[in-house]
Regions:
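Short extracytoplasmic
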Residues: 18-50
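Short secondary-structure boundary micro-motifs
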Residues: 6, 14-15, 43-46, 103-105, ...
Length: 207
């Protein structure tokens, strides 16, 4: 039996991605707020992330009510086992946060259901509920088994998929309120970008 070694990078066959222009600086009731920067990692961790991802984007948005949402997006052209996505659970732990209440869930959008993970990161008085998802190629998947399965599907065709990790978080002691605000933000963001960009950011809905 011949073993297929994935060599064709899907990223090389797709349009070049630019996270800075892909996600608008203002959309719906949201605009960039430069007063708060999303979680920054130490230089050693950043060097590791630079090996995994081709591009990263970190922004904070604020709405007219003064509510803030932090957005972090990372794009990698090679999402094989060699360069698996760096999960937020690991990032936050490395920065001294306690990570708890990790739950797999679904986020209903106007385009379909998005599989997400939710978790709570706590450091001192900082209570940061987080929603994130991963894409492998054109499909949003939960990290772990589903992620490996999607990588395998590409691997069987000799292809190496690209992928995204999208993290949305808020500093809020009320987790329910935080997740509701994050859901609204995500829905607004998906509405503000084109079909091609939405597929890259959140996968093909219904696939």
């Amino acid at each position: 039996t011949k073993i297929v070694t994935p060599t064709i990078k899907v990223a090389d066959q797709r349009d070049i991605i630019n996270l800075e222009t892909m996600i608008p600086s203002a959309f719906g009731d949201w605009k960039i707020d430069n007063s708060i920067v999303p979680l920054q990692v130490d230089p050693q961790t950043q060097a590791k992330l630079d090996r995994i991802y081709n591009q990263t984007l970190a922004r904070t948005y604020m709405n007219s009510l003064g509510q803030r949402v932090m957005l972090s997006v990372a794009y990698g052209g090679d999402q094989s086992d060699n360069l698996a996505v760096h999960k937020p659970e690991v990032c936050y732990l490395s920065q001294g946060f306690a990570v708890m209440k990790i739950v797999a869930g679904e986020l209903l959008t106007q385009y379909g259901i998005l599989p997400v993970k939710r978790l709570l990161a706590v450091q001192g008085n900082r209570n940061e509920p987080i929603t994130y998802w991963i894409t492998v190629g054109d499909k949003a998947v939960l990290p772990g088994f589903e992620q490996k399965l999607q990588q395998l599907r590409y691997g069987l065709t000799g292809s190496v998929p690209d992928g995204m990790l999208v993290r949305v978080s808020t500093i809020n002691p009320d987790e329910g309120d935080a997740y509701r605000l994050q859901a609204l933000f995500i829905q607004d963001m998906l509405s503000a970008i084109g079909v091609k960009e939405r597929t890259r950011l959140a996968g093909t809905f219904g696939a």
